UniProtKB/Swiss-Prot annotation:
A Pfam family: Conotoxin
Signal peptide: 1-22
Positions carrying 4-hydroxyproline: 55
Residue stretch(es) of the prosequence: 23-48
Keyword check for Transport: no
Domain notes: The presence of a 'disulfide through disulfide knot' structurally defines this protein as a knottin.
Protein name: Omega-conotoxin-like SVIA mutant 1
Disulfide cysteine pairs (residue numbers): 49-63, 56-66, 62-71
Tissue expression as described in the entry: Expressed by the venom duct.
Provenance organism: Conus striatus
InterPro entries associated with the record: Conotoxin, Conotoxin_omega-typ_CS
UniProt keywords, alphabetically: Calcium channel impairing toxin, Disulfide bond, Hydroxylation, Ion channel impairing toxin, Knottin, Neurotoxin, Presynaptic neurotoxin, Secreted, Signal, Toxin, Voltage-gated calcium channel impairing toxin
Length: 72
């Protein structure tokens, strides 16, 4: 019974701490888009879509549209 109470109190304290820190950090990151694109390499930024004539499927993204397994 004591162990159950201790576990419940610990979970409540940890939850409260997470909620407090989440509210404090709200709006702290000013430039989200700048930071997310800075982590990407140049090859990831330039090869987002496949050119026309390339094979396409579920996992590949065409610059135009995928028609019968080829980018158009």
């Amino acid at each position: 019974m004591k162990l159950t109470c201790v576990v419940i109190v610990a979970v409540l304290l940890l939850t409260a701490c997470q909620l407090i820190t989440a509210e404090d950090s709200r709006g702290a990151q000013k430039h989200r888009t700048l930071r997310s694109t800075a982590r990407r390499s140049k090859s990831e930024l330039t090869t987002r879509c496949r050119p026309s004539g390339s094979p396409c499927g579920v996992t590949s993204i065409c610059c135009g549209r995928c028609y019968r397994g080829k980018c158009t």
